[in-house]
């Protein structure tokens, strides 16, 4: 088999993987509540033993009950942060065994609300004391793609979007709302380092690499809209600097070693990166990505776009 043929086959396998398993972010089933506290706090099996005076800060994690969001909450708590999660689900999905622990006090403050509604975010920040926001809201297949029901099988959170779940509303609008509120909050409180961490995608940088625009040109329209939404948020965050410190992570495929169903896609991404396809970055474990994001929040010198080399440096590979 020639090198060209091998690369073509890997590229084809990668494109299939991209279409079906690109990412595992969360957007939970809808609720009519603007922003409320669920009846219980859910256990994430991590305890924050630091006092408020020792804490590196207090953060709001948007989409904190999803695949990546839960990992960020756990890691942030372990690093000493005070953590509030906002999602439409309110509480993360729990097994029957885990549900028996709900009466125990845990340190992550889970709130139920819709980040498409600005009031949901501003109400939480108005409580004061926040030093950063992490945006982990997203979805692979939106309602306009005609494939939204497949999210139950390819989404890390197994969420099914509602009729109003489009890339523009879920990715762009929720992030724009949060960025605008964060900017106002930082100015009002005279904060010199309010961090905003956004989960973008490696493919958002395709225009800057060889072959990127060519590959993007053959993607279905719904995947192009996915990338348009990511890029619009990146631009919005950059425009908000230096009032807020922009942290933009661009992971490739996000996976977890305890989910073997993702290994087909992971192998395709690793193979494409190994043979030198410039438009394919290495996959990253959800644990490594979460650690990267939390370390970036703590380190005031970290800002801008973080691709795989930076993710590997900050968060490792495990």
Where do the protein language model's features map onto the residues?
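Substrate-positioning beta->alpha
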Residues: 174-177, 229, 280-296
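Flexible, glycine-rich beta-alpha linker
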Residues: 206, 244-272
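N-terminal chloroplast transit peptides
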Residues: 1-38
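A conserved pocket-lining segment of Rossmann-fold NAD(P)-dependent short-chain dehydrogenase/reductase
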Residues: 268-284
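N-terminal Rossmann NAD(P)H-binding glycine-rich loop of SDR-like oxidoreductase domains
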Residues: 57-81
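Conserved Rossmann-fold NAD(P)-dependent oxidoreductase catalytic core, especially the SDR/UDP-sugar
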Residues: 60-62, 89, 146-228, 239, ...
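Conserved glycine-rich Rossmann-like NAD(P)H-binding loop of the short-chain dehydrogenase/reductase
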Residues: 81-88
């Amino acid at each position: 088999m020639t090198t060209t043929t091998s690369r073509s086959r890997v590229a084809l396998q990668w494109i299939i993987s991209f279409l079906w398993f690109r990412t595992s972010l969360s957007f939970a089933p809808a609720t009519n509540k603007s922003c409320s506290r669920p009846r219980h706090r859910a256990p994430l099996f991590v305890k924050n033993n630091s006092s408020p005076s020792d804490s590196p800060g207090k953060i709001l994690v948007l989409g904190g009950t999803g695949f990546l969001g839960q990992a960020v909450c756990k890691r942030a708590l372990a690093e000493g942060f005070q953590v509030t999660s906002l999602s439409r689900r309110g509480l993360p999905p729990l097994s029957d065994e885990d549900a028996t622990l709900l009466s125990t006090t845990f340190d992550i403050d889970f709130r139920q609300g819709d980040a498409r509604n600005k009031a949901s975010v501003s109400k939480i920040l108005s409580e004061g004391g926040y030093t950063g926001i992490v945006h982990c809201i997203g979805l692979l297949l939106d309602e306009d793609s005609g494939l939204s029901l497949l999210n139950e099988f390819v989404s890390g959170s197994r969420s099914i979007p509602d009729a109003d779940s489009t890339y523009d509303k879920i990715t762009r609008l929720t992030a724009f709302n949060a960025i605008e509120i964060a900017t106002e909050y930082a100015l009002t409180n005279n904060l010199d380092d309010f961090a905003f961490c956004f989960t973008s995608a490696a493919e958002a940088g395709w225009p800057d690499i060889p072959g990127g625009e060519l590959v993007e040109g053959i993607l279905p329209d719904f995947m192009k809209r996915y990338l348009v939404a990511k890029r619009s948020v990146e631009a919005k965050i950059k425009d908000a600097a230096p009032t807020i410190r922009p942290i933009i992570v661009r992971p490739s495929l996000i996976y977890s070693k305890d989910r073997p169903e993702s290994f087909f896609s992971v192998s395709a991404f690793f193979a494409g990166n190994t043979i030198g396809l410039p438009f394919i970055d290495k996959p990253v474990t959800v644990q490594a990505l979460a650690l990267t994001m939390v370390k970036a929040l703590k380190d005031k010198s970290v800002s801008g776009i973080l691709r795989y080399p930076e993710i590997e440096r900050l968060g490792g590979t495990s």
